[in-house]
UniProtKB/Swiss-Prot annotation:
Protein name in the entry: Small ribosomal subunit protein bS20
Pfam families: Ribosomal_S20p
Keyword Transferase: no
This protein's record includes keyword Ribosomal protein: yes
Biological classification of the source: Bacteria, Pseudomonadati, Pseudomonadota, Alphaproteobacteria, Acetobacterales
Record key words, sorted: Ribonucleoprotein, Ribosomal protein, RNA-binding, rRNA-binding
UniProt GO BP: translation
Length: 89
């Protein structure tokens, strides 16, 4: 248990930040899921549109430090490749 006022404050701050980060991760995952569902359905235009909306959301999560920038780069690259493959198929 925290003994000092500053330690109690850090606990409160950490909890607020954790809740914010959980919300950001959930939002990002939702956008990714929309792209993946469009890809599975084979809908080229919906997949491209969903990717266009998901990309800034994913980059925002990386910018806020919720997830590592290289991880987001990798996820975006793979998702983009799948959308492009769908467009050419």
């Amino acid at each position: 248990m925290a003994n000092t006022a500053s330690a109690r404050k850090r606990i409160r701050q950490n909890e607020r930040r954790r809740e914010r980060n959980v919300a950001r991760m959930s939002r990002m995952r939702t956008f990714i899921k929309k792209v993946e569902l469009a890809i599975q359905a084979g809908d080229k235009s919906a997949a491209a549109e969903a990717f266009k909306v998901a990309q800034p959301e994913m980059q925002r999560a990386a910018g806020k430090g919720v997830i590592a920038k290289n991880t987001i780069s990798r996820k975006l690259s793979r998702l983009s490749a799948r959308v492009k493959a769908l467009a050419t198929a």
